[in-house]
Amino acid sequence: MRKLFLTGVFAAIVSVPAISVAAPDGKNRKVTVANMSNHVLRELYASPVTAKTWEEDMLGQRTLASGKTISANIDNGTNECYYDLKGVMDNGRTVEERNVNVCAASKWVIGETSDSVQ
């Protein structure tokens, strides 16, 4: 399974500037994930739409508290722009956004009852 690299720094946790590496094709795949729900985001996945399974959890041992954001460079080296995004909250709720153009979208807002990609 291809590895998904998270090269952005978790801005909500660490107060240092985000570090990112430009993709070989020059396209920005950096997406800000904003947790505007009342729950903690426990898991975060981003997989190319062509993948049959979810890539590894991008948060690892970390979580994203309510009201916080992270910045992630979603680039697994395939030069793909269309990804499926998935989050798992601490209450078991799963949120998904399918077929997201991460080369154009810059923010995924996870709300209490709805989600949006901007």
Could you tell me what each predicted segment is?
Residues 1-4:
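Positively charged n-region of N-terminal signal peptides that target proteins for export
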Residues 6-18:
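Hydrophobic helical h-region of N-terminal Sec-dependent signal peptides
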Residues 20-24:
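Boundary at the C-terminal end of the N-terminal hydrophobic targeting segment
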Residues 27-31, 70:
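Structural beta-strand segments of beta-rich domains
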Residues 31-40:
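Asparagine-centered strand-capping/turn motif at beta-strand->loop junctions
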Residues 52-78:
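Intrinsically disordered, low-complexity Pro/Gly/Ser/Thr-rich segments with frequent PxxP/GP/PP motifs
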Residues 80-89:
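A short, solvent-exposed beta-strand micro-motif common in secreted/extracellular proteins
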Residues 93-118:
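Extracellular beta-sheet/turn segments enriched in Thr/Pro/Gly and aliphatic residues
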